[in-house]
Amino acid sequence: MIGILLVTHGEIGQSLINCAAHILDSTPKSVESLSIKSNNDLSKYTYIISQKIQSLEKGNGVLIMTDIYGATPCN
């Protein structure tokens, strides 16, 4: 299964996961979110994203999605 990492502003990613869980009647496997706040040091997120990718990687890759192209989470 391909892992999915949602990198978003605020809690948008977790809200999307919660919506999917409501529709599917179960929490999706291999899906995680990371909330990015623009007032934080963005360099710290490099390590966190690497760790999340490693935990999601099961041999088929990881799809990384952001909420707004070109915005802070996308950079």
What are the functions of these language-model segments?
Residues 2-75:
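N-terminal loops that bind phosphate or other acidic moieties
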